[in-house]
Structure formats: structure tokens, C-alpha cells
From Swiss-Prot:
Its cofactor is Mg(2+). Necessary for normal cell division and for the maintenance of normal septation. It comes from the Bacteria. Keywords: Cell cycle, Cell division, GTP-binding, Magnesium, Metal-binding, Nucleotide-binding, Septation. GO terms for biological process: division septum assembly. It comes from Rhizobium etli (strain ATCC 51251 / DSM 11541 / JCM 21823 / NBRC 15573 / CFN 42). This is Probable GTP-binding protein EngB. The gene is engB. NCBIfam families: GTPase_YsxC. InterPro entries: G_ENGB_dom (IPR030393), GTP-bd (IPR006073), GTP-bd_ribosome_bio_YsxC (IPR019987), P-loop_NTPase (IPR027417).
Length: 217
């Protein structure tokens, strides 16, 4: 199969770099999607489940551990001109950790806002919401940031296996109503469970459509 026809989620992904400041960003090239969410929302687990690789994104029981923008791309590309990966997934630092020092929070906010505002190749941010807790104030603050930066974002419920199945459609409807008037919000929400695999294909397809890739599995 030619390199350009590799299914997006049908072969391994690799970590290429952590970005502690904008100086370390890779050159703009392939389209990017980013994942944002509160500490311990299940962000790393969801990225690992998406690409079917348990150890790709580091998971931790320590909230606030990830303090960089972590870049992941499909393997098999040199990264040189003419052989770039088709897209990148960016794992953003978790937010909302109550014990994080103010200096750390300020640094995170500046890094994220500068990235959001200035990254032309960023196509969408997937904001993860823990289905057990719904939208919290920290989430609203980040949605405000995204609206201000005029970056398209889509909400994704995580850990739906932790709530009763009949509650999921109601939660989706309630959450959609809460963001209905937000200017940068994509109106269609997704629900996922990394543990059970629920909703992963829908999220894979959404990502592929966002970056303009037809062959995703």
C-alpha cells in the first residue's frame, strides 16, 4: 500500500516531541487536532485507545503531570519535505488541578493561548468532559479561551462506562444545550469510553473528516 494510502488509525503512531514553549513547536505543515481536558479526565487513555497503543501517551495517577504540548504522528514518515505525516495529534497539558501553583497555571495558560491563537495548522480542539461530572468552571474557562481565540472545538464525553447507559443521551443533550450559544463550538457532541471502546470509531471518523483524510481504518 502506498504511503499516502495508509489508513490513518490502521498502523502505529509515535511520539515526536514535547513542546514546553512556542520556540519548540515543529514547523507548520500537516494539519493538527489537539486534545484538552481537566487533569485525570482520561485524555491520555483516550489517545492511546484511539490509536490502539496502550503506552503511547503517558498516563499518570498524578494530576497535572503533563506540562507540555505533546506531539504524536503516524509512523512511517521521514518528516522531510515530501514525506510528511498526514496529520498530528497534540496532547495539551491537563488543567484544573487544584494544587497547581499559580505560576504553573499562568505558564500553562500563556502556552496554550499562544498556541491556539497562532497555529494556522490547528483544525480543531477536542475538549474532553468527564461524563460523571459534566462541564465544570475550569472547562468553561477553557471554552472561553477557545471562543476568544476563534478556534473550532468539539466536546467529547469520556468515561461513559462509569455512568448508566440511559443517562448518556440525556447528558449529551444537556451539555449540547449549555454550549449552544458559544461561537466556536461544534454543535455535535461525541461520547466515548476508553475502557469499553465505545464511540472510538465515531471519534476517529470525526478527526479524519476534520483533517480531510478519507482512509482512516
Amino acid at each position: 500500500m502506498p504511503e499516502t494510502e495508509k489508513p490513518l488509525f490502521g498502523h502505529p503512531w509515535i511520539f515526536i516531541r514535547g513542546v514546553p514553549s512556542l520556540n519548540f513547536l515543529p514547523p507548520e505543515g500537516p494539519p493538527e487536532v489537539a486534545f484538552a481536558g481537566r487533569s485525570n479526565v482520561g485524555k491520555s487513555s483516550l489517545i492511546n485507545a484511539l490509536v490502539s497503543q496502550k503506552g503511547l501517551a503517558r498516563t499518570s495517577n498524578t494530576p497535572g503531570r503533563t506540562q507540555e504540548l505533546n506531539y504524536f504522528v503516524p509512523d512511517g514518515y521521514s518528516g522531510e519535505a515530501g514525506d510528511l505525516p498526514p496529520m498530528a495529534i497534540v496532547d495539551m497539558p491537563g488543567y484544573g488541578y487544584a494544587q497547581a501553583p499559580k505560576e504553573q497555571v499562568d505558564k500553562w495558560t500563556k502556552l496554550v493561548f499562544d498556541y491556539l491563537r497562532g497555529r494556522a495548522t490547528l483544525k480543531r480542539v477536542y475538549v474532553l468532559i468527564d461524563s460523571r461530572h459534566g462541564i465544570k468552571k475550569n472547562d468553561d474557562d477553557v471554552l472561553d479561551l477557545l471562543d476568544k481565540a476563534a478556534v473550532s472545538y468539539q466536546l467529547v464525553l469520556t468515561k461513559t462506562d462509569k455512568i448508566k447507559a440511559p443517562a448518556v443521551p440525556k447528558l449529551l443533550a444537556e451539555t449540547a444545550d449549555k454550549i449552544r450559544k458559544r461561537p466556536a463550538a461544534y454543535p455535535y457532541l461525541l461520547s466515548t469510553s476508553s475502557e469499553k471502546g465505545d464511540g472510538l470509531d465515531e471519534l476517529r471518523q470525526a478527526i479524519a473528516e476534520t483533517v480531510g483524510i478519507a482512509n482512516w481504518k
